[in-house]
A protein has these predicted regions:
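Proline/serine/threonine-rich low-complexity linkers at boundaries of modular beta-sandwich domains
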Residues: 136-148
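Proline-enriched interdomain boundary motifs that mark the N-terminal boundary
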Residues: 147-155
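Extracellular fibronectin type III
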Residues: 136, 226-241
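Conserved aromatic anchor
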Residues: 61, 160-180
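Recognizes extended acidic, P/S/T-rich segments that occur
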Residues: 78-110, 180-214
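Beta-strand-rich modules
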Residues: 211-233
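Long, polar/Ser/Thr-enriched low-complexity segments
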Residues: 31-113
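Surface-exposed, short loops/turns at beta-strand junctions within beta-sandwich domains
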Residues: 114-121, 210-217
Length: 241
């Protein structure tokens, strides 16, 4: 009788221990996966460039970030519109800055509304991976607020003194979307000379030291009106030295 009691006690204890172990095992929570670090892009820009003299329009992209090996851009509809992947040494070392220009078709050949529809307004997502396996990302708001081209002129005051002037810009070009235009800067380019000035400035005197280096004859220049959205419009001009 004693041995039967002892056996029963041992069996009950073993059962209790087994139950305890089973419950302990079931109650142990799963360890959550470690989140992948996210690195922000230093620069993520997408913008229109319209040449009012040539009547062509295209989309430019500029981005900058540390040591990425893969990157893609999605439009507001979540469609991938651009993708780049490094190979060989670029897969191992990564890339940083990237600037590219899309083709700029003439609006005489590609209707404006068709081109605008290819690149809808809204938020464009930039996302990729660094060489360390981290996520790198950024976003940019893309607008159809495209400024008109300024009226430009150039005056050669003396052989080495050149003044370039232009008109204010407060509206889009005729036929473009009726968006609010807020020009924040103008940029002047004369061959290798380049300067950017606030929107309140409407003329630039090109340094005579630079003008002196130009050969006699006709030379081209550009004035860009740059909107707060980042979109910009070029007007071309020329002068004779």
């Amino acid at each position: 009788m004693k041995s039967l009691f002892v056996s029963s006690s041992v069996g009950i204890a073993a059962l209790a221990l087994g139950t305890s172990l089973a419950l302990g095992s079931a109650a142990a929570p799963a360890r959550p996966a470690s989140p992948v670090p996210v690195v922000p892009l230093d620069i993520a820009r997408i913008f229109w460039e319209f040449n009012s003299s040539a009547n062509d329009l295209g989309v430019h992209v500029f981005l900058d970030g540390e040591d990425w090996k893969f990157l893609r851009i999605k439009n507001p509809n979540n469609n991938v519109i651009f993708q780049v992947k490094g190979s060989g040494p670029y897969q191992e070392l990564g890339m940083t800055e990237l600037f590219f220009e899309g083709a700029e078709p003439s609006l005489d050949e590609v209707p404006l509304q068709d081109l605008l529809a290819m690149f809808p307004e809204g938020e464009y997502d930039f996302e990729g991976r660094t060489v360390d396996g981290e996520v790198i990302e950024g976003d940019a708001i893309f607008s159809h607020a495209i400024p008109d081209g300024p009226d430009v002129s150039a005056t050669v005051v003396s052989p080495d003194l050149l003044e370039i002037s232009w008109s204010p810009v407060v509206a889009p070009p005729p036929g473009f979307p009726a968006e609010l235009i807020q020009v924040v800067e103008f940029q002047v380019i004369v061959e290798s000379f380049q300067v950017t000035v606030p929107a309140s400035v409407l003329s630039v005197t090109v340094p005579p030291q630079f003008v002196a280096t130009l050969a006699p004859g006709e030379h081209q220049f550009e004035v860009l009106a740059i909107d707060a959205s980042g979109n910009q419009t070029i007007t071309e001009g020329s002068f004779v030295k």
